[in-house]
Every structure is written in C-alpha cells, then in structure tokens.
Amino acid sequence: MKIYLIKSFGLKTIDKVIHKLESFELSEFSYGYCHYDLLPKNFHFDNKDNITFFDFDFLGKGYLVNDIMTFWIHLSLNATFNKMSQEEADHSFNILIKSYREIRQLSEDEIAAIPYLSFAFWIFYMGYHIEHFDDFSNTFFNQKFVIERVELIKTLTNKYCHFNT
C-alpha cells in the first residue's frame, strides 16, 4: 500500500514538496510541542468561551505552525467540498492568524509553508491508517478509500501548492 501511495503521487510531487519546504529558513520556524490534529472534532468551547483540547494521539515535537496547518486543512476541505466558499475559508483563516499573532510570533514564511506541510501531514496520516489497520482503520481502509483519499490529496496539492517549475 505504501508503494501505491508513492506511485500515485509520483516522486516528482514528493520531491517538489521537499524542495519547497527546504527553500524556507526552517531553523527560524517556532518549534515545540504540537497537537498535530486541531480539527473541530478535537476541541470544544463551553458556554464561557473556555476551550478544551482532546485527542492527543498525534502529540509530538515539531514546528508550531503545524497546529495552524491542521486547522487550515479543515478550512481547505470545507472550501474544496463547497461547505463554505474559499472567501469564507480565507476569512476564517485570517481571523485565526490575527488572533494567534496577538499571542505569539508567526512569520510569513511559516504561513507560506502551510500547504506543503499539509501534504506531508496527509502522507503521514495515510501511513497512520496503514500502521493501525488492525485496531483503527480496518472498517474503512480499503481500495476505494485509498483511491478517493489520494485523489483528494492531489486536488488539494494542485489547488494550494504553487511550485516554481
């Protein structure tokens, strides 16, 4: 299955993503512990606007922008599936960035890296499904799922990743 994923994306796309990420000054990106899965299903606001985070199974060290990236994935999926317009997704993302910057620094390069980091996240997540087949993904991880997910990742990559050819 891993070979299929690599062939589906083509080594050229993977190389382009790696090259693009290497074009950033990654040593200047903020680094620390990341949740790595800040999708709406993994946090809750109570009636006093307190937030609770849960589902820490992907927790690890990395670039802090990865947490913003996972929320960006949520917005980009909603825009791609027409659950919201691209303008609404961009507006929501800009609110997140503005609010985040009120608390900590976030560079333009970190923001620009998000679509490429999301590609890496999708590859990781597909690997997660493979590695945890017996205890997690066996009910849905089949050929149809893989084909649909690969096509989705291709669509998102084509839409949001801008490679200098």
What feature does the model see in each segment?
Residues 37, 55:
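Conserved catalytic-loop position in the HRD/HxD motif
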Residues 1-36, 46:
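An alpha-helical support segment within catalytic cores of ATP-dependent transferases
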